Amino acid sequence: LVVFVGAILLTFPLLAEALPGQPELKKQGTAQQLFVDGKPFLIIGGELHNSSSSSLAYMEPIWKHMQELNANTVLAGLNWELIEPQEGHFDFALVDGLIQGAREHDLHLVFLWFGSWKNGMSSYVPLWVKSNPQRFPRVVLKNGEKREVLTPLGEASWKADAAAFAALMRHIREVDGKQHTVLMMQVENEPGILNDSRD
C-alpha cells in the first residue's frame, strides 16, 4: 500500500457547477478531509507502476490483488499519447475500461496525468508532439545541451497539454460525474528536467 503526499486536485470542481456528493476536501478543525458522497473517506491506496494501467488486459488480475490488499483506491497513470494519438482526436476507451474495472471490484481511482512530463522527462507525449520540435520546442540547458524534454516555455506545448487534459476531465465528468469512482486527478507528475534545475 502506498502512502502518498503531494499536490493533488479533486477532479470535478474544475468543471463548472458542483454535482451533489462529488468528492471534495472539507476543513475539519485544522485539517482537510476528503468527503465522498457526503461522508468522510480515507483512501487506502495502492499505486501502480508507471505504465501498468496502459493495458486493460494487464489490469485484470491487479483489480483482485488490490482487493486482497484491502485497498479501496487505485492510483493509476493515464498517459497523453494513449488519450490523444492524433491531434484533436481522443480515445477514451482505456479511461472507460479502468473506470469500469474499478467499479466491478468496488474500488475508487486516483488518476495521475502523464502529460508533458513524467519524472522529469517527456516520455508520454503523443508522437505528433515528439516528432515536431519546431512547434513543440525542447529544453536547452545552460551549457547549450539540448534535451528531449518539452520546455515549459513553449506555448504550443502547454496549450496542447491543457486541451488534452480538459477533454479528459470533461469525459470523466460525463461518465463518472454521478458515481464518483474517480476521486482525484494528479496534474502532471514530477515536472522539470533531470540533472538540471531549469530551461
Predicted stretch roles:
Residues I44-G46, V74-A76, L109-L112, L183-V187:
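Hydrophobic faces of well-ordered beta-strands that scaffold small-molecule active sites
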